Amino acid sequence: MGQKVHPYSLRIKINRDWKSKWYFDKKLYSEILHEDFLIRRETMKFFKGIRFDISDIEIIRNNLQRVTVVVSTPRPGSVIGVKGANLEKIGQLLTRKISKKINIKIKEIKKPEFDAQIVANGIAKQLENRASYRKLLKSSLLSSISKGVQGVKIKVSGRLGGAEIARSFEVKEGRVPLHTLRANIDYGFAEAQTTYGVIGVKVWLFKGEVLGKQTNSDAGQVINRKSSREKSEHFDRSRVDDRGRKVLNDDKFSKEKLELGSKSNNDFKKKNGSDV
């Protein structure tokens, strides 16, 4: 059976960026990676009451002793707390855990319907509150489509409606081209802790295709595309056919060049007195 690759890992450096931004010596890699896992785990544990309001946690390191943690949320007020109390507490907690200076920043999501993780979190939250999964998925799908998303796919898996056997249910609207690398696909996953067990929620949002200039990733340079008109009008002086006629790039001969080549060929025959 064909398996789905994560849309982010497939599009890294095409239209997606890393969620941990740092570069250190090979010997320190495992230690710093472990710290990143710890920071994300402790941050989500601290914000357990409002975990459905957090979309993403980005970690940036400029040096070994300073870490910047960027929390993306559509409700920054609930994350910051009264006079920044929550930020101060989580900062102190993480500093004790990894013995480094932590700087917490909040990034506001202005359009929650365009964020797949927030949509998945919202569905998981309502499933925990015993909402009907069929109505819930269809309403979430229509809400995102009405806001301008080009394609939506939502899938829930588990003991849906308290059924004895776990199964999956999926709804889809519009285009969701998972194999198109230039497609801007947003992906989110959440888990709903119900009385019957865990229900997994997956959301794919298609926001359009990333077009424009072609980028040469190897050289890190921008290649300017030539229009088709420029290509057809450009004359390649280095290409000459076996009769002395010059050839255009699109392999079409102009009338003027054909006559010129034919005349030069006849002159050559008369001069040498033999067929060529």
UniProtKB/Swiss-Prot annotation:
SUPFAM superfamilies: Prokaryotic type KH domain (KH-domain type II), Ribosomal protein S3 C-terminal domain. One of its GO terms (molecular function) is rRNA binding. Keywords: Ribonucleoprotein, Ribosomal protein, RNA-binding, rRNA-binding. It holds the Pfam family KH_2. One of its GO terms (biological process) is translation. Signal peptide: none annotated. Residues 39-110 form the KH type-2 domain. GO terms for cellular component: cytosolic small ribosomal subunit. Residues 218-243 are annotated as: Disordered. Residues 227-243 have a biased composition (Basic and acidic residues). Gene3D superfamilies: 3.30.300.20, Ribosomal protein S3, C-terminal domain. PANTHER family: 30S/40S RIBOSOMAL PROTEIN S3, SMALL RIBOSOMAL SUBUNIT PROTEIN US3C. Belongs to the universal ribosomal protein uS3 family. Binds the lower part of the 30S subunit head. Binds mRNA in the 70S ribosome, positioning it for translation. Part of the 30S ribosomal subunit. Forms a tight complex with proteins S10 and S14. This is Small ribosomal subunit protein uS3. It comes from Borrelia hermsii (strain HS1 / DAH).
